[in-house]
Amino acid sequence: MLRFALLAVLACLAFAADRGTLRAGAARVDITPAPGAALPMSGYANRTEGFKAIHDNIYARAIVLDDGTTQAAIVAWELIFVPSKVWEELSQRISREAGIRSENLLVAAVHDHGAPSLAGGSTPASPATEAYTKKVEDAAVQAVLEAKAHLQPARFGLATGTASVNVNRRELTTDRGWWLGHNENGPSDKTLAVLRFEDLSGKPIAFLLNYAVHAVVMGPSNYQITGDLAGAASRFVEQFYSGKLQPRSDGGDRLRLRPQEKVGGDGPVVLFTSGAAGDQNPVAMASGEDFTLVNALGQILGEQAVRVDGNIKTNPQARLWGMQQVVTCPGRRVDEGPRPRTQYTFSDADPVPIRLGLLMLDNVALAGVSGEVLTMISQRLKRESPYSQTLMITHANGSSGYIPDDAAYDQVSYEITTTRLKPGCAEGAIVNGFLDMMRRY
C-alpha cells in the first residue's frame, strides 16, 4: 500500500514539474465572401442558387497556447465542415508557417448552414469555390499567426452551465417512422461549457464555448450569409466584454460588466464549437429570411455563457499535450437517398476513416472528432473519461459524415439513412480511442 501511495505522489510531482506558465493569444479574421461571388451555400440540398446577400459577417477565430515547451492552436470557423483535404493542407501549412505541430491542432467548423461551401466536400468543384477555399485557408493561417504574435502570460479556467436551446430532432411519427422533428423526450445534452483565457490583470483574452446544436435556425429558403446562432452567440459575448452591449439591469448581477473586465475594441475572441449535435436541432427555427430567432437564441447562449463565466476560477500554470489517431470503420452506401421509411437496404462501400484529436490543457480534455456525432457517444465519453472536464468538439480535423451511436441504428431516421458507417464500430472506436490517448497523457 505504501509503495502505491509513493508512486502516486511521484506521478503527481512529475505532472506538476511538467506544468509551465501559460501564455495565450487570440485573433479573428473575416471570411465573409465578396458580395456577388458565385458561391453555392452549404447544408441544404434543395437550394437551387448561390447566396444573394450578406446578413452578418462570418469569421475564422483562433486561440494559440504555450506552456513554455509546447504550443497548441484551436481554430473555429463559421462554416459547415472542415473537408478532410482542407484539413490535410491546412495542418501542414500551420505546422510549416506557425511552427505548431498537427497533433496539437484542432480545426473545427460550427456546422453553419448559412455559409458558402468549401471545395473538397460534396459540392462540385468550381473556380469560385476553389478561390473561396484558398481564402478561408489563408484566413485560418493568418488567425493563428496573429494569435501567436499576441501571446502573453495568461490564466485559464473552465466551468459549465445549462441552456435549453437544443432539442433532439429524431421524432417517431405515426405514418413515416422516425424522421426529422422535435422530440423533447429524446436524449439531449444541455451542457454549455465555457473555457476562459484571461491576462494577469483579469481581462479576458478569449473564450471557447462548447454546445451541442445544429446551426440551422435559418432554413433552406434563406439565401443570406450568416453565422446563424453560433455566430450570434460569439458576437454577443465579444460585444458584451467590449462594452458595446448593455443588457437589462434585471438580467442578473453577472450581466453587469465589471470595469476591470472591459476589453474595449472588438472585445475578446470567442470561439463557438459544436458538441455532439448530430441529432440536436435548435429548439425553434425560422421560416423564410426572418433572423429574429437567430439573434434571440444566440443571445440566450451568449448571456448564459457570461453567467457561467462568473463561476470560473483561473490558474496560470498549465501543461499542454496533444495526440491524434485515425480509427477506421466498415463503410456502406444506402441504396436510396434519405427519405422517411421504416426499412432500408445498403451496399458495402469503402471503409470510413475517423480522425480523433485529443488536446489536453492540464485536466481539461478537448476531444475533437472528424464527423457529425450523435449525442449518446459524447455522453458515454464524458461518463467514462477520467477527466471530469471533457468536451467533445465535432466537425474537427476532417469530415467523416454522420456518426450514430450503436443503438440509434434501430431507429431508421435521417441520420441513419445518410451515414456512411455500418453499425457496431464507430461508437466503441471513438470512446476507446480517446480513453487510450488519455492514458498516454
Which ranges hold each PLM region?
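Sec-dependent signal peptide recognition
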Residues: M1-L7
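Hydrophobic h-region of N-terminal signal peptides that target proteins for export
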Residues: A8-A16
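Conserved beta-alpha junction segments in alpha/beta enzyme cores
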Residues: A17-A108, A115-V269, T273-A277, M285-Q299, ...
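Charged, flexible cofactor/metal-binding loops and thiol motifs
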Residues: G302
